Amino acid sequence: MKKGTVLHSGISSVISRLGHTDTVVVCDAGLPIPSTTERIDLALTQGVPGFLQVVDVVTQEMQVEAAILAEEIKQHNPQLHETLLGQIERLQQHQGNTITVRYVSHEQFKLKTADSQAVIRSGECSPYANIILCAGVTF
């Protein structure tokens, strides 16, 4: 459910169509995106825009009740993982709800992207910088 204003029409459109438990993926530049899933490609060059920046903008407009990460982020990108968990904590406080964070293998994560409403590709070039955001309700 939409909460604010995003300038990118594709992102705004996807968020406005979300129902409870629908998912949106924000990913790094390397995640394979199924041909059957809507692709919103923001990647301009390596690192632009960054993964955390895209997650921040998307979650300003999207009500989130859960997030799914690849288990591998803990070992292979611990600094980004900790920063992302902090971002999720701040989002919980802003929304006034608890956001459940679950972990799956990277292979399972890639399979789950096929069920999402869209995959938003950032320019991030660090390992396992991917998240599945599960839509909540604003009431």
UniProtKB/Swiss-Prot annotation:
E.C. number: 5.4.99.62
Active site: 20
First-listed, main subcellular location of the protein, grouped into a coarse class: cytoplasm
SUPFAM superfamilies: RbsD-like (SSF102546)
MF terms (GO), sorted A to Z: D-ribose pyranase activity; intramolecular lyase activity; monosaccharide binding
InterPro entries in the cross-refs: D-ribose_pyranase (IPR023064), RbsD-like_sf (IPR023750), RbsD_FucU (IPR007721)
Biological processes annotated in GO: D-ribose catabolic process
Enzyme class name: isomerase
Residues that bind substrate: 28, 106, 128-130
Keyword annotations: Carbohydrate metabolism, Cytoplasm, Isomerase
Intracellular or extracellular location(s): Cytoplasm
GO (cellular component) term, any one: cytosol
Superkingdom in the source lineage: Bacteria
Annotated catalysed reactions: beta-D-ribopyranose = beta-D-ribofuranose
Pathway named in the protein's UniProt entry: Carbohydrate metabolism; D-ribose degradation; D-ribose 5-phosphate from beta-D-ribopyranose: step 1/2
Gene3D superfamilies membership: RbsD-like domain
Quaternary state and interactors: Homodecamer.
Role of this protein: Catalyzes the interconversion of beta-pyran and beta-furan forms of D-ribose.
Family, similarity comment: Belongs to the RbsD / FucU family. RbsD subfamily.
Protein name: D-ribose pyranase
